[in-house]
Amino acid sequence: MSTNQGSLWGGRFAGGPSDALAALSKSTHFDWALAPYDVTASRAHAVVLFRAGLLTEEQRDGLLAGLDSLASDVADGSFGPLVSDEDVHAALERGLIERVGPDLGGRLRAGRSRNDQVATLFRMWLRDAVRRVATGVLEVVAALGDQAAAHPTAIMPGKTHLQSAQPILLAHHLLAHAHPLLRDVERIVDFDKRAAVSPYGSGALAGSSLGLDPDAIAADLGFTTAADNSVDATASRDFAAEAAFIFAMIAVDLSRLAEDIIIWSSTEFGYVTLHDSWSTGSSIMPQKKNPDIAELARGKSGRLIGNLTGLLATLKAQPLAYNRDLQEDKEPVFDSVVQLELLLPAMAGLVGSLTFDVERMAALAPAGYTLATDVAEWLVRQGVPFRSAHEAAGAAVRTAEERSVGLEELTDDELAAISPELTPQVRDVLTIEGSVSARDSRGGTAPKRVAEQLQIVREITARLGHELMR
């Protein structure tokens, strides 16, 4: 049997927990990440206890001095958890008592439970973590924007179903990856509105009878308000699930970008060359240059999706209020942040270092009869109903396929035989440059529209960067 050393409970028990229970309960291997936030919250709690008349000025100052010393030692690594410490809270209380003595150190726990304490610390940690992640996402967006700006007129094959569809600008495609990532950052900004609610003062579930001021401690800790319901405040982890979703969505968006890079860098496509610093080789095949960053991004998306679904499964069917199941809420979220902080700078570097073969992309852009839609729309502009225009353009494709030529290589007689409306003037739209320039609706792939889109992406990026600094 173990002793009760390192725990914040025990008076009701005749002995300590079994070794197996102690090992199962221990959480310092992951919740130590909350230690700096725990000390910060303890400082605010000491002030609130003083305001409530539960500490003298001398006791308050003594606790604050002890907490300052503890914070310094936690920061430089000279203080850490012992094997006997059950969790971060127990370890830090031990550290405080070592510095100020058991009488003064033991007063700090008044009016708070680990239930409201950990819910508060988790929110504090997450609010900082999502900002770091958002900054990394914006760096990937900046890399996409820089590549788009560097290739304002480069044309590539646009795909649907991974089949040739219509010519588009490379910049248009790159910016299409930027927008989902910007929406992810917008989700982070919006998430903070709900995360900025302090559970502190809720106690175990029913609130406090000691005259504490939850609003004051919320303000001291940088929250916008205190929780309206103490049961909800201690029992709910929807904020963690929301963050886990955002992280998973970021990973999915990165995975789609990564998939494009993997395909584009293949010999068969040959759209991009990977920079040596952002790719790897093979242990047996000397010629290989592998897109490992992109492949790891694709793989890690599954990991982050798993973190989200695992957390949701943990949360379902828990009765109110707090349950020990909630010890399992932090590791998946912590892991998602760790993975994104590894992945985002690597993806930004990969994207920024890509070398595009714009001549090859342009040469492949008309392949697969991607100008067929332009033929149909040209006929519409001549007054032909779209149904008939679609049939005529399809027939032109079939004729070109039979001859193994491009649409632009069909003779005037062949075009006229398909439809009398297909006059030689249709050749005006049978170029990839003409096709791209013609699609000048808002959001379209015409160069002037894509230039507008780049400006919009940069404006949104700047706005979000400013909002994250608040």
UniProtKB/Swiss-Prot annotation:
Task: Give any GO molecular function from the UniProt entry.
Answer: argininosuccinate lyase activity
- A GO cellular-component term linked to this record: cytosol
Q: Which EC numbers does the record give?
A: 4.3.2.1
Could you tell me which CDD domains the record lists for this protein? Argininosuccinate_lyase
Gene3D superfamilies, from UniProt?
A: Fumarase/aspartase (C-terminal domain), Fumarase/aspartase (Central domain), Fumarase/aspartase (N-terminal domain)
Q: Which reaction does it catalyse?
A: 2-(N(omega)-L-arginino)succinate = fumarate + L-arginine
Main location as per UniProt: cytoplasm
Its pathway is: Amino-acid biosynthesis; L-arginine biosynthesis; L-arginine from L-ornithine and carbamoyl phosphate: step 3/3
* BP term (GO), one: arginine biosynthetic process via ornithine
Q: Which InterPro entries is this protein grouped with? A: Arg_succ_lyase_C (IPR029419), Argininosuccinate_lyase (IPR009049), Fumarase/histidase_N (IPR024083), Fumarate_lyase_CS (IPR020557), Fumarate_lyase_fam (IPR000362), Fumarate_lyase_N (IPR022761), L-Aspartase-like (IPR008948)
SUPFAM superfamilies the record matches: L-aspartase-like
| Compartments it resides in | Cytoplasm
Q: Which UniProt keywords apply?
A: Amino-acid biosynthesis, Arginine biosynthesis, Cytoplasm, Lyase
Pfam assignment, any one: Lyase_1
State the family named in the UniProt similarity comment for this chain.
Answer: Belongs to the lyase 1 family. Argininosuccinate lyase subfamily.
Quote the protein name from its UniProt record.
Answer: Argininosuccinate lyase
Q: Which gene encodes it?
A: argH
